[in-house]
Amino acid sequence: MIIGIGSDLIDIRRIENSLQRFGERFVNRCFTDIEIAKSDARKNRAASYAKRFAAKEACSKALGTGLAQGVFWKDMGVVNMPGGKPTMQLTGGAAARLQEMLPVGHRAAIHLTITDDFPLAQAFVIIEALPVAPAEGTV
């Protein structure tokens, strides 16, 4: 069952301006080490950061908190699954909020799609609660 949906649309030029104006202070405040390494290696660095920024905003909306109630920028990070598909890795307050949302006997699956077409970057997040299969041999 779907327990959270969030979306965000951002102007890449806004992130370009923040990168120029605040540099590493902005990057280190908002992004995880994995996101920084990936984005800094990209040809279009600002677009890469913008997609990740939009993903964090969308995820915070799907969590129902926005960037409040103990959910911070670096609690949410875009990571890639082995096949390359992006997803969100949650820690800290974001992970705690996700656990609060889950019905008993369920685990979370976070679905993420990110895209950019200058001057815009966009992200959608769907949080799904999936039933946990009972362990074999239990009654």
Swiss-Prot record:
BP GO annotations: fatty acid biosynthetic process
The keyword Magnesium appears for this protein: yes
Major subcellular location class: cytoplasm
Binding-site residues, Mg(2+): 8, 57
Record key words, sorted: Cytoplasm, Fatty acid biosynthesis, Fatty acid metabolism, Lipid biosynthesis, Lipid metabolism, Magnesium, Metal-binding, Transferase
Family membership noted in the UniProt record: Belongs to the P-Pant transferase superfamily. AcpS family.
Protein name: Holo-[acyl-carrier-protein] synthase
Provenance organism: Sinorhizobium fredii (strain NBRC 101917 / NGR234)
Gene field: acpS
